Amino acid sequence: QXPSTAELCKINSNACSVPFSXIPCQKXFLAACDRHDTCYHCGKHFGFKQDDCDDAFFRDMTALCAHGTDDEGXCPX
């Protein structure tokens, strides 16, 4: 049995499209980046436009950044 498109989308999402490696708090953003990659690669199958993906990514990142950093400026755990 061939894997479904949804299963392939999960397999192929690894946030590898992050353009540079020195992003502060990169691990804290990994899930949001994975969702954005998945949306870009597979969104058409589910009826999403790239603008929808970008809007969702903006909301995800805004929510993550709202938590801020600790007193030493370190990323949230």
Swiss-Prot record:
It catalyses: a 1,2-diacyl-sn-glycero-3-phosphocholine + H2O = a 1-acyl-sn-glycero-3-phosphocholine + a fatty acid + H(+). Its cofactor is Ca(2+). InterPro entries: PLipase_A2_dom_sf. The keyword Disulfide bond applies. The active site is at 36. One of its GO terms (molecular function) is phospholipase A2 activity. The modification Pyrrolidone carboxylic acid is found at residue 1. Inhibited by linoleoyl amide and MG14. Keywords: Calcium, Disulfide bond, Hydrolase, Lipid degradation, Lipid metabolism, Pyrrolidone carboxylic acid, Secreted, Toxin. It is found in: Secreted. Its EC number is 3.1.1.4. Coiled coil: none annotated. One of its GO terms (biological process) is lipid catabolic process. GO terms for cellular component: extracellular region. Expressed by the venom duct. Belongs to the phospholipase A2 family. Group IX subfamily. Heterodimer of an alpha and a beta chains; probably disulfide-linked. Heterodimer: conodipine-M catalyzes the calcium-dependent hydrolysis of the 2-acyl groups in 3-sn-phosphoglycerides. This activity may be supported by the alpha chain. Conodipine-M inhibits the binding of isradipine (a ligand specific for L-type calcium channel) to L-type calcium channels. This is Conodipine-M alpha chain.
